[in-house]
């Protein structure tokens, strides 16, 4: 029996369709070990399951098994010297993103930990993860110099523009008129073409146009909303890191909270953590009816993974005003300037704690990006909150 580098088997991933491989992933996470494979190429679904949970090694042989530690699932540590030979190496090895205990005082023994995703280098957001996974897979079959494109509310467009360029592709991003200014400007800085549709009320309303243009012009529509590499990037990255960090940090992890955009990162976090411990709570946050919070949307607008996976979750609603109240509270409690989608998740968790709906323990809030991108919203929030001495 032996352990083989999983990178030698990545070519089998594209042959796996659908979500049936996730049953293998769930079983490995629940049992804490994987069985040995006589011929890994003859079991592509099992190989993909190991890849998606973050294993770097495959157990090869007969009648044996290996633990998650032996598979490399726990092999996450930032190089002490923080020296990287390339930007992509920085992205890959500059992990995990920090998990920080907040000083916020929530009722009923609920302790808040902030997963700071603005430590991803390209877009300063969680969207780097799907952008790298999508483009790296695409690079195995699409000629360099090709045009890649997608609809975005802002962060994914920045990430796509940067990552596409690093892999030798041209990028185009489509944005609704209400997108944040950084989302319109930074892709141009990164060499991408930017198309803003002032008539589109939201990002998803741009998808028919992107699909039509892709058919007519022949570019690659990467489609973050329905590309399973999005969900799988968060399984390998965001969710796995929360699992490893909570174990290493000695957290009594009782739940995870986060906002819904494509549903990629929170579907992955819920699936991964509930596979390890089915009692883990997942609080998923959407804007209140008739309200708008940058980067997130309501479930009924159409989300793939949250509706396809066997996960348990509580859906919470938050207004933009409430989200920005939480941004102010975290800034004054912790000195950390989180974005409105992170504020929405903090506020939702606080509401659930106040209602007595959460067990005492540690709860991780995924903070997708930084509030430095949303200064007009911060200014409006301060007019309501006032100064604090």
Swiss-Prot record:
Q: How does this protein's activity depend on the pH of its environment?
A: Optimum pH is 6.7 for O-acetylserine sulfhydrylase A activity and 8.1-8.8 for cystathionine beta-synthase activity.
Keyword Protease (UniProt): no
From the UniProt record, list the reaction(s) this protein catalyses: O-acetyl-L-serine + hydrogen sulfide = L-cysteine + acetate; O-phospho-L-serine + hydrogen sulfide + H(+) = L-cysteine + phosphate; L-homocysteine + L-serine = L,L-cystathionine + H2O
A GO MF annotation of the entry reads: O-phosphoserine sulfhydrylase activity
Give the record's keywords alphabetically: Amino-acid biosynthesis, Cysteine biosynthesis, Lyase, Pyridoxal phosphate, Transferase
- Protein's pathway: Amino-acid biosynthesis; L-cysteine biosynthesis; L-cysteine from L-serine: step 2/2
Q: What is its EC number?
A: 4.2.1.22, 2.5.1.47, 2.5.1.65
Stretch forming the signal peptide: none
Query: Is the ATP-binding keyword given for this protein?
Result: no
* Functional summary from the UniProt entry: Cysteine synthase that can also catalyze the synthesis of S-sulfo-L-cysteine from thiosulfate and O(3)-acetyl-L-serine, as well as the sulfhydrylation of L-serine by sulfide.
Query: What's the family?
Result: Belongs to the cysteine synthase/cystathionine beta-synthase family.
This protein's assembly is summarised as: Homodimer.
Q: Which PANTHER family match?
A: CYSTATHIONINE BETA-SYNTHASE (PTHR10314)
Annotated protein name in UniProt:
Protein CysO
Please tell me the species this chain comes from: Aeropyrum pernix (strain ATCC 700893 / DSM 11879 / JCM 9820 / NBRC 100138 / K1)
């Amino acid at each position: 029996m032996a352990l083989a580098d999983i990178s030698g088997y990545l070519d089998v991933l594209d042959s796996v369709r659908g979500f049936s491989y996730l049953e293998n992933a769930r079983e490995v996470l629940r049992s804490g070990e994987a069985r040995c494979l006589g011929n890994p190429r003859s079991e592509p679904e099992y190989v993909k399951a190991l890849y998606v949970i973050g294993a770097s090694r495959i157990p090869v042989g007969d009648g044996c098994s290996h633990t998650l530690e032996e598979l490399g699932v726990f092999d996450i540590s930032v190089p002490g010297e923080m020296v990287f030979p390339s930007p992509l190496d920085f992205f890959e090895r500059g992990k995990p993103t920090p998990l920080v205990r907040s000083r916020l005082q929530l009722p009923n023994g609920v302790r808040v930990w902030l997963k700071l995703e603005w430590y991803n280098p390209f877009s300063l957001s969680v969207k780097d993860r799907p952008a790298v996974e999508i483009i790296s897979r695409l690079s195995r079959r699409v000629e360099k110099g090709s045009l890649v494109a997608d609809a975005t509310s802002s962060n994914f467009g920045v990430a796509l523009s940067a990552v596409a360029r690093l892999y030798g592709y041209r990028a185009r991003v489509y944005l609704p008129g209400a997108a944040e200014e950084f989302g319109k400007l930074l892709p141009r800085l990164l060499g991408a073409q930017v198309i803003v549709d002032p008539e589109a009320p939201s990002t998803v309303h741009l998808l028919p146009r992107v699909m039509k243009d892709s058919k007519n012009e022949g570019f690659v529509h990467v489609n973050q909303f329905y590309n399973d590499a999005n969900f799988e990037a968060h399984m390998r990255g965001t969710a796995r890191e929360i699992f490893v960090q909570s174990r290493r940090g000695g957290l009594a992890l009782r739940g995870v909270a986060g906002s819904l955009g494509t549903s990629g990162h929170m579907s992955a976090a819920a699936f991964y953590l509930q596979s390890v411990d089915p009692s883990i709570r997942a609080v998923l946050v959407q804007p209140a009816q008739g309200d708008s919070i940058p980067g997130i949307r309501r479930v009924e607008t159409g989300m793939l993974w949250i509706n396809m996976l066997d996960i348990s979750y509580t859906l919470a609603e938050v207004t933009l005003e409430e989200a920005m109240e939480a941004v102010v509270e975290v800034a004054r409690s912790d000195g950390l300037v989180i974005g409105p989608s992170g504020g929405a998740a903090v506020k939702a968790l606080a509401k659930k704690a106040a209602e007595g709906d959460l067990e005492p323990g540690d709860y991780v809030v995924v903070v997708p990006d930084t509030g430095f991108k949303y200064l007009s919203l911060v200014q409006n929030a301060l007019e309501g909150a006032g100064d604090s001495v």
